[in-house]
Amino acid sequence: MRYGIFSLLKNSLSGHQNWPAAWREPEPKLSYDVIIVGGGHGLATAYYLAKEHSITNVAVLEKGWLGSGNIGRNTTIIRSNYMLPENNPFYEWSMKLWENFEQDLNFNAMVSQRGVLNLCHSDAQYDAFARRGNAMRIDGGDAVLLDAQGVRKLYPFFDFDNARFPIRGGLLQPRGGTVRHDAVPWAYARAADARGVDIIQNCEVTGIKIDNGRVAGVYTTRGFIGCRKLGLAAAGNSSEVGAMAGLRLPIESHVMQAFVSEGLKPLIDGVVTFGAGHFYVSQSDKGGLVFGGDIDGYNSYARRGNLAMVEHVIEAGVAMIPGLARVRVLRSWGGIVDMSMDGSPIIDKTDIEGLYLNAGWCYGGFKATPASGWCFAHTIARNEAHALNAAFRLDRFRRGYTIDEKGVGATPNLH
């Protein structure tokens, strides 16, 4: 069924009791052409495999329910304000896919291009933002460099006067914004299912079978499932799943916390990031401030953080907006992020025939979902990288071709 005004009116006559299921709950087949592990980027990959490459004998294996992983545990921000030539075109393509997301998948994902503003607090940071903005514009993106007065016009309640970290200006990307994170896996699942993809929930991979250097299938909690090609898109569990195939990945897993405050009157129109500390905030449609900051800094697979980081993140928020000191936090949650050694992702085939890897997303996984799935589908279908992900090779760390957007070196917890 196509969602629209007519289907809404039709189902309103029955009190909305006769809506069909958005996707099927199939039993696993004995084998598939392609299996994708992970219900975040994996769903996007399956959709684009079916749509762009007509490969429909595909299964997506999710160990929990759809949306229970990082795809539903983020702060909903989308942006493409990168500078390096390896990153910028990729994220700009993702932004373009976001802009057509709802029309393409026939699903209301609440795509809101309300703008993303990065604050700067020194002359050097202002110059760096000017360079970044120029790089964005060269690659076809949008960027506006604001001085302190320009920022004050947008957000007069920020700490401008006698501030510990004076605001010198900011870099605004008007096309950035937010997307309802729960709606993204639902939209991809519905669209992929309509094209024949099997989405198998509560199916955890426990092993990978390799015969003579080639993938033969996966062992799961629902039995063995054979396949010709296997794509790993397991986010924070990438290292564990990769180890099942004998891969030792240049990735660390860390917990990252996110928070939402009590509901407030309209306050923050867009997305704002603090330049003197790691803090980013937007306001949801319910009025809650959705915010986050640094990862907890220690390796963990637990989806919960510690109070020291809660204090650290909120201190940064209050330094930017003193009025937040009186706002109560409603709840918090955690997700496991796969931190690569240079802060950039890996989308590549491996040395094992038929095995492909999508991992190392650090803080940037959600915003990259469409482009990640699109490029990963191309890599799996054609057994070669697309130009957009050609630089995201697994062997770049050995070859010395790292993509270090922040320039902090091989320290995963700093990216």
Task: Please provide the spans of the model-predicted regions.
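Extreme N-terminal leader/targeting segments of oxidoreductases
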Residues: 1-33, 51-55
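Glycine-rich FAD pyrophosphate-binding loop
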Residues: 50-71
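Dinucleotide-binding Rossmann-like beta1-alpha1 core, especially the glycine-rich loop
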Residues: 75-157, 278, 308, 316-318
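Short beta-strand to alpha-helix junction loop
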Residues: 89-92, 119-128, 171-190, 200, ...
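Helical element adjacent to the flavin cofactor pocket in flavoenzyme catalytic cores
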Residues: 171-229
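Central helical "cap/lid" subdomain
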Residues: 220-269
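Active-site lid/adjacent beta-loop-alpha segment flanking the redox-cofactor pocket in flavoenzymes
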Residues: 248, 263-356
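C-terminal catalytic lobe of FAD-dependent flavoproteins
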Residues: 318-415
